[in-house]
Amino acid sequence: MKKKFHFAVLLLLFAAGRRSQAQNTIFLSQGKIEYERRINQYARMEDENSWTELEKKTMSQFKTSYFDLLFSHGKTLYRPGRESADKGSSFFIDQPAQDNIVYADLDNEKSVSQKKIFEEVFLVQDSLRKIKWKITDETRAIAGLSCRRANALIMDSIYVVAFYTDEILTSGGPESFSGLPGMILEVSLPHQHITWSATKVEAVNVPDAQLAVPVKGKKVNNSTLLETVQHSLKDWGKQGQQYMQLVML
């Protein structure tokens, strides 16, 4: 009888602990996330056989950039963040997606992106990217938040690994990545050797004025932009293909 009583007490204590933990979890509806984007330039060079060891030595292995994502309820704004200490040269003469500003209205499934491609600025107005995610059981902590892994395939051939947290209610993410039951804190494109990873999450008030829709650039949709970029890069070979993939993310 005593054993049963002790076991019942332990169950009650465990349940109370779990309930207390759930009550202490803060679910964010607005705030700011900093992402670090890392491109493994050496790996990209190995994919492009024309590069020499001498050329490889002129640049650092990883090209690092920082971006901020502001979010408030069903809206997000992804934009360039603080300057990186990385001053090394780039695999690309013109670093693609370096100045991207991406606004997403998640409730209405609309996106407006301002993208600089070479010397021209485009304003891409379209619906949100449709991504068929497959959620897995793998978990990890990112920026202090518990995250779960999901996999997907985009643009017919790009394999995506993402980790999202349901502790942030907004279902957004960096660049055009969204559609999971929470905020995406890490995205990896293994075959493109690129990773976006949240370095910090701040619970701050985000006024509507800070989520301003970008307005600068030639108005296009994703299909028109793809045709334009393909035409411009038709003689670039494999490097052109890699550039185009970054532009269209």
Segments from the language model and where they lie:
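Bacterial Sec-dependent N-terminal signal peptides
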Residues: M1-L28, L246-L249
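Extended soluble regions of mature proteins
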Residues: Q23-L249
